[in-house]
A protein has these predicted regions:
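Active-site segments that bind and position negatively charged phosphate/pyrophosphate groups
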Residues: 97-220
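A glycine/threonine-rich phosphate-anchoring loop and its flanking beta-alpha core
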Residues: 2-104, 202
């Protein structure tokens, strides 16, 4: 869309942040995997095979789809690996905005936690029932809501370090995005944990039902 609407320049410049797009042709989306949230987001990512660089563009409503047709049945034939990697991507779109070191809004936290609980619950169903329409529908809708800006309200926009790191891995090694994120997040979490252990304790309790202790490190060690 950016390339067609801005023919005077190399579209890669938008991803290098050396130029800013001024237009985009209207886009419609038909998701064939629940993962990226592109069907409702204002961001996009491409890989340049000249150097194997993976970059995201400047977030803009210009490239937000004008309409989306969402049919969970289109996801039935996905391999288990792609289905579960997609679920990780959805979780991470929420978690990148959830794990911030500022005071957040209770309602946004509740929305984010509900999304994460829904994805985890239904991802387990799909391990045994890949053709479960309701589970596919829940995850597809969660994927849209996780990356349309809703879960970033009152969070300062999010951290996004894990996504930036994964883009480097994905560009160099052609790693499935969700799989790369799952490999990175644990190390990132340990690195930032001491900055806000209360946040990790809240996550452990509200998402995984780990009993809450006054000592945050006992809840989320």
């Amino acid at each position: 869309g950016y390339g067609v609407a801005n023919p005077w320049t190399d579209v890669w410049n938008f991803f290098l942040k050396t130029e800013v797009p001024t237009a985009c042709i209207p886009i419609g989306a038909i998701p064939t995997i629940a993962a990226s949230g592109s069907e409702m987001s204002g961001s996009c990512v491409i890989t340049n095979e000249d150097g194997w660089l993976k970059r995201g563009s400047t977030r803009s409503d210009l490239c937000r789809p004008k309409f989306t047709l969402m049919n969970p049945r289109l996801n039935y034939t996905l391999p288990e690996y792609q289905t579960e990697s997609g679920c990780v991507d959805i979780l991470m779109h929420t978690m990148e905005r959830y794990f911030v070191n500022i005071e957040t809004m209770e309602i946004t936290d509740s929305i984010s936690e509900s999304l994460m609980q829904t994805v985890i619950y239904n991802a387990r169903i799909l391990l045994n029932e890949p053709g479960n329409y309701n589970a596919r529908a829940e995850i597809m809708w969660a994927g849209s809501l996780s990356h349309n800006g809703l879960t970033g309200c009152g969070t300062g926009g999010g951290d996004w370090a894990c996504h930036q790191l994964e883009h480097e891995l994905g560009g160099m090694f052609d790693v499935t995005h969700g799989a790369g994120l799952s490999a990175i997040w644990g190390s990132w979490a340990r690195y930032v944990y001491d900055a806000n252990p209360e946040r990790f304790a809240q996550f452990a309790t509200n998402i995984f039902d780990i009993p809450y202790f006054a000592d945050y490190e006992s809840t989320a060690p």
